[in-house]
């Protein structure tokens, strides 16, 4: 990436080659760089600042529900990982192992954490004794390693940043309540802050997390019609508790197993932001997540008083995340650069504007230009940012709804998947064989059984037997 030509060169059209468009945007918006290890990326300031804002927003929401942050080691002894059979089998192909340390072979291999259930379970088994110790509501921000065969920045990398919450409860009801609570927290965050509408639902048994009783998911639809799993919340029941002997003494002085949950979100969300809102000029960031909400571009900045006025304007706009671009680049270059980086509002101000006590505001998403009095500029920018946030969500929801189809037969299902990228709603009998057959024949996977169930047919779209659930299907990242 360092050897790329000019940042503001034209990027591949998303309609021509969506995958290349995505790569171009990631490169030219300077979000990440490639490292010397295949599948590992370096977060550049522009990319990491988005993740910092995601962290800040989510962390506050977690803590409002009573969650506390902790940090677990990155290494897991092999014997500990092997304690929960389904869990280890689910992750075995992706695990990275440390076999040597300090120049010597280790007596026991250490796994570089792909996820931390086993560490939290081992910890809980030592600190939970009584019902008075419950619930335990812990979260950690860290990186994990999964040895993926194919990788793409943000969407699938060997090492990625995430948060993983792990809770322990006295009853099954409390655990289920927490599982759903966190899923809804995720969905609300995505819709309110990232302006990405979500389908909330339950994964099929085939798609659920290894070792979980139930996995709930939020699914988003990208601009190219592919789905992106954007956050998951798992109810483990007492399965892990039995494997790790996590017991507590209840009020009747009887030993009981705890019921557990885990839930996580990752830097995939940045990929979702790019693919839901981006256009052929680069990123388009919703104001609430944008590291810089307003950029001031002085015109003819070497003229007397222009930079001083820009600095004065920055102070006036202190309620927003604002920067002045006083670099030596031309105004046209700066416009393209800030469009590429998705900054929501650009303020243009030059000698004639100063004389007229005005500035020009440009919205990133619609390119709409507004001439506004400097006396009212802070109010007007606030209105633009609020409108932009709301309208970006509406556009994304309209796009998703326009690309959500129904199928009532195998032939119709295959035709929709082949010719109409998007979500496909179809009834399902509940049998894994049908799920496997649909994937084999069409490449579509079950995304979720939505909480908002509909009855669009009596029979399974695959086998024709009595249907049990409506499922959202689709090709996915």
From Swiss-Prot:
Catalytic activity: tRNA(Pro) + L-proline + ATP = L-prolyl-tRNA(Pro) + AMP + diphosphate
Domain of life of the organism encoding this protein: Bacteria
Entry EC no(s): 6.1.1.15
Cellular localisation: Cytoplasm
GO molecular function: ATP binding; catalytic activity, acting on a protein; proline-tRNA ligase activity; transferase activity
Pfam families noted in UniProt: HGTP_anticodon, ProRS-C_1, tRNA-synt_2b
Xref: InterPro entries: aa-tRNA-synt_IIb, aa-tRNA-synth_II, aa-tRNA-synth_II/BPL/LPL, Anticodon-bd, Anticodon-bd_dom_sf, Pro-tRNA-ligase_IIa, Pro-tRNA-ligase_IIa_arc-type, Pro-tRNA_ligase_II_C
Record remark: domains: Consists of three domains: the N-terminal catalytic domain, the anticodon-binding domain and the C-terminal extension.
Protein name: Proline--tRNA ligase
Species, as recorded: Lachnoclostridium phytofermentans (strain ATCC 700394 / DSM 18823 / ISDg)
Lineage: Bacteria, Bacillati, Bacillota, Clostridia, Lachnospirales
């Amino acid at each position: 990436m360092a050897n790329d030509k000019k940042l503001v060169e034209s990027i591949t059209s998303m309609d021509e080659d969506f995958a290349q468009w995505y790569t171009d945007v990631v490169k030219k918006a300077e979000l990440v760089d490639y490292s010397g290890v295949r599948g590992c990326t370096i977060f550049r300031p522009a990319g990491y600042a988005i993740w910092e804002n995601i962290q800040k927003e989510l962390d506050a929401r977690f803590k409002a529900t009573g969650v506390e942050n902790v940090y677990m080691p990155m290494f897991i002894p092999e014997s500990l990982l092997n304690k929960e059979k389904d869990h280890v089998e689910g992750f075995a192909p992706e695990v990275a192992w440390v076999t040597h340390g300090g120049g010597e072979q280790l007596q026991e291999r250490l796994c570089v954490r792909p996820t931390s259930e086993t560490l939290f379970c081992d910890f809980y088994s030592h600190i939970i004794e009584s019902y008075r110790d419950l619930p335990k509501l812990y979260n950690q921000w860290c990186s994990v390693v999964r040895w993926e065969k194919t990788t793409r920045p943000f969407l699938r990398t060997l090492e990625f940043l995430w948060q993983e919450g792990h809770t322990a409860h006295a009853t099954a009801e409390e655990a289920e309540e927490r599982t759903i609570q966190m899923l809804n927290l995720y969905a609300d965050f995505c819709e309110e802050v990232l302006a990405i509408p979500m389908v909330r639902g339950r994964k099929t048994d085939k798609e659920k997390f290894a070792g979980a009783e139930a996995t709930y998911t939020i699914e988003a639809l990208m601009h190219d019609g592919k789905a992106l799993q954007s956050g998951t919340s798992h109810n483990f029941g007492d399965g892990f508790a039995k494997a790790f002997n996590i017991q507590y003494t209840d009020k009747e002085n009887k030993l009981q197993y705890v019921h557990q949950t885990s839930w996580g979100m990752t830097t995939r969300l940045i990929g979702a932001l790019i693919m839901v809102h981006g256009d052929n000029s680069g990123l388009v960031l919703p104001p609430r997540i944008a590291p810089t909400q307003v950029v001031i571009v002085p015109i003819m900045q070497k003229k007397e008083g222009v930079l001083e006025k820009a600095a004065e304007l920055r102070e006036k706009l202190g309620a927003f995340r604002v920067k002045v671009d006083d670099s030596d680049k031309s105004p046209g270059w700066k416009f393209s650069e800030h469009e590429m980086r998705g900054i929501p509002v650009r303020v243009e101000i030059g000698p004639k504007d100063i004389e007229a006590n005005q500035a020009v505001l440009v919205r990133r998403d619609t390119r709409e230009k507004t001439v506004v009095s400097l006396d009212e500029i802070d109010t007007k920018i606030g209105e633009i940012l609020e409108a932009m946030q709301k309208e970006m969500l509406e556009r994304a929801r309209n796009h998703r709804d326009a690309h959500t189809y129904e199928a009532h037969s195998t032939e119709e299902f295959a035709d929709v998947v082949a010719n109409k990228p998007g979500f496909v709603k179809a009834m399902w009998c509940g049998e894994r064989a049908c799920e496997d057959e649909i994937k084999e024949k069409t490449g579509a996977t079950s995304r979720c059984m939505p909480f908002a169930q509909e009855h669009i047919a009596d029979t399974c779209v695959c086998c024709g037997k009595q249907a049990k659930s409506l499922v959202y299907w689709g090709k996915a990242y």
